[in-house]
Structure formats: structure tokens, C-alpha cells
């Protein structure tokens, strides 16, 4: 289970969901376990003590003595190597020659062990990106199931990959396909995972406090395709330069985007008669040798482009998930599933059935011809840009919160194009106001989210959308993004009742 390491004494850093899962897994597989957390009494300590009584727990700042007798460090994804205390401990581990793995590396080693021991060789599909990970992961899992395969969905989406693997082993229900949502934090400490197909949906600024730079952030995302030389089908967003830069030399990635696809097997959008269609590019044998113009090759090879025709799959409006950004998520999911040869017709049936994930451009209510949408999961600038562009309607935007040191200037253009007004909340309200000052949208402050909903309702006109898409984290005003969404929905319900409408 641990590669060349034989049941090492494991130091688990951090006791969140992933840390607890790693401690459980290592203990279950015969390792002595020491767990360290900078908190003296983390919430999961009670579960650790109940489930793994032999584990040693050390609370408080990390000290180098934690490494004494240790053969493997298993680090939780929330711990940044740039944080001084964590960074010093990791440097000391490297100096002692102690490997540092994350949960997904433990998962990858476990799959390799199971294949060697019993021949278990599932397909693995992996998904990352700044925005759209959870929707694409959940949708991919649904499509795999609709195509008749048993599937396990895990990772950043929860449950943890190791907890899910343990449960599958215990119940003798190992799946045909694993669908993994992976964050940049998880990928940073993943070394041997080799998925059959993987996608980076997009890369926009986020978590720079954790990674230190956009270059480091993008490099972590690119680790999803596995070690150099592994045969992973790359599924790339051709509308995103940073993801297309990840194409491996000499390979032809599958691409998706909101334009027409130009390479066989890629997905895109055909606009016909004012209606956008999802389409698949197929080789056009009739075009061979007829002197028809060649399409520009979009992949990384220097081979001559293959003429393609565009097969209509379904109108984008037939999707229950709203917005063109969700259409791109759907195309990424289709591409991943086709990479493991799942039948297209079954996948399209599943696509029509999928109704989306909570708090991701989720419709809440229609009040006096104004629609209210909850995109509380939009915790960065890129997510809000995607929501504004994807809805393609006049919007009153509610934005603000904990800014995380982001540059808000990329919001100015879509706000100018789509927003009637922006209601500003939270700690970053002033920074947002500065960034949007010249956009032409009315900028209004609100002290609370409830006040923001009422002000947005006053500003909106019939046919508009009131969109909560904060472009910020929630912790300055709320417990988390789910709590923020609950407050928003409650405020919308109160607004409906005040106007004599049953929500």
C-alpha cells in the first residue's frame, strides 16, 4: 500500500477531513500513526481517539521533533508550504530524506497495490480547475453511471478518496470507474497518480496566498495529468490559454470550448438561427482530397489538420444547468467519458437529466418577473466573470466578502456589459468599488446580505436577474459559503412573502 515503504511510521499533518482519512487509512494498514495539528483540540480529535486509539496526537505549533522516528509525512491539503511553521517542518523532512505525500498520493499507491495483488484496474477520471470542478465531477459521475458502469465519486468533492476506497474494499464493491475532484492543494503532493483521462477546466487567479504565484498555481493544476510519459488523455479548455499551454508535446489533446471545435473528438458550440448547439467534431471523410480548406490545427502536434464536420448533440438550452460556463462543464464531462469509450447516446440522456449542484448559479425564485440566483460558491473573480457571462442577461450583482488579495479589475468588463447595478458587501467592498468605478453600473453599499437583497430588488427591472456571486470568500461575515447561501435564500423568501408571493 505504501510502495517501497514497508508500513512506515507515519506523521499526519493536520486533522481536517483529509487528515483524519489519512490517519484512518494508515492505521488500518498496519502503520504506527502520529498526528499533529496546530490547534490544541481540533474538532476531529474525538473521532481520531475513538477510531484509532493507538494514534499519538500532538497539538500546537509544529516542531522538528515531530519527525523523530518517522518514515513518511502525510500532509493535509489545507497546509501551505509557504506558511513559515509548515515550511520549516517540510524542509527538515526533506533534509532527513523523509518523503512527503498527500491523500491522493496514498490513494494512487493503494490502487497500484490492488492492481498488483488482485488485478483490480479501474478507469480513473480526474478533474481540476479554478471554477466548475464540483459540477463537472458530479456530472461526470452521473454520466458514467448512466452508461452502465459502477462508479465512485470522491476527492475534494467529499467524501475523501481514502475513506471511499476503504468503504468499497470493506463492502467488496470496488467500482469500474473512479471520478476524482482534485484541488491544486491536493495535486501539489501527488506524484504517481496516472488517470486515464483528466481535465483542467480553467485557471484564473485564486489561492495565490497558498501557492505564492500564478505560475506555481498553474503548475500544481498541471500535475493532474500524471508523471511525464504516462498515457493520459488531456481534456483542455481551448478558450483558456493557461490550460492549453499544458498540452504535452507530440500529443493531440481533446478540447472543449464555446467556439467550433477543429479537431476530431473535440467538443464545442455551433450557433444556428440564434440557438447554441453542443457539437462534436468528427472526421469529414467526404472532405478528403476535394480541395476544401483545411481547418487550423488546435493541438500541440505539427501534423496536418484533419477536416471535420460538426455533429449536433443537443441544444445548450436543453441543459438544466444554466449559463454557457455550465455548457463548457458539460462538454468537459462528455469528453472525459468518451475518453474511456462510454456510449455517446447514454451520456446525452444523462446530460439532459442532470439538475446541477447547490449554490452554483442555482435558481432560487422568480419575484415580479425578476429571477434570483444563488452562486455563493463563486468565491473568486473568475467564477463571477463566468456567471455574469454565462447567464447573458441584465443583472443586479451582489458581490463582496473576504477578498483574498485578488485583483478585481477583470470584473470591470463583464460588469460593464451585463450589470445594471452592483450591491457591495463585506470587507472587500471598497476594493470592488475602486475596480468597478468606471464600469457604468450603479454601485450601492449594503451592511448585510439581507439589506443587499432588498436593495437589489429595488434596482432590478422585469426580466433582470439578481445574482449573488460574491467573487470573495465568506468568512468575514459567515461561517462558510453554504451559510452565506442560506442567508441569501432566506432573504429572498422574506422578500417574496412581503410581496404576497409564496416562495
From Swiss-Prot:
Q: Which residues cross the membrane?
A: none
Localization per record: Cytoplasm
List the keywords (alphabetical).
ATP-binding, Cell cycle, Cell division, Cell shape, Cell wall biogenesis/degradation, Cytoplasm, Ligase, Nucleotide-binding, Peptidoglycan synthesis
Q: Where does ATP bind?
A: 129-135
Please name the GO terms of the biological process aspect recorded for this protein, alphabetically.
cell division; cell wall organization; peptidoglycan biosynthetic process; regulation of cell shape
InterPro entries in UniProt: Folylpolyglutamate_synth_CS (IPR018109), Mur-like_cat_sf (IPR036565), Mur_ligase_C (IPR004101), Mur_ligase_C_dom_sf (IPR036615), Mur_ligase_cen (IPR013221), MurD (IPR005762)
EC number, UniProt record: 6.3.2.9
Q: Which reaction does it catalyse?
A: UDP-N-acetyl-alpha-D-muramoyl-L-alanine + D-glutamate + ATP = UDP-N-acetyl-alpha-D-muramoyl-L-alanyl-D-glutamate + ADP + phosphate + H(+)
Q: Pfam families, alphabetically?
A: Mur_ligase_C, Mur_ligase_M, MurD-like_N
So, what pathway does this thing act in?
Answer: Cell wall biogenesis; peptidoglycan biosynthesis
Q: List the residue ranges of the region (Disordered).
A: 284-305
Claim: Cell wall biogenesis/degradation is one of the keywords in the record:
yes
Q: Name one GO cellular component term.
A: cytoplasm
Going by the entry's taxonomy, the superkingdom of the source organism is recorded as Bacteria
Q: What is its main location?
A: cytoplasm
Which residue windows are coiled coil?
none
Specify the enzyme's EC class, one word. Answer: ligase
Q: Name one GO molecular function term.
A: tetrahydrofolylpolyglutamate synthase activity
Role this protein plays: Cell wall formation. Catalyzes the addition of glutamate to the nucleotide precursor UDP-N-acetylmuramoyl-L-alanine (UMA).
Which family does the similarity line name?
Belongs to the MurCDEF family.
Q: Which PANTHER family match?
A: UDP-N-ACETYLMURAMOYLALANINE--D-GLUTAMATE LIGASE
Q: What is this protein called?
A: UDP-N-acetylmuramoylalanine--D-glutamate ligase
Q: Which gene encodes it?
A: murD
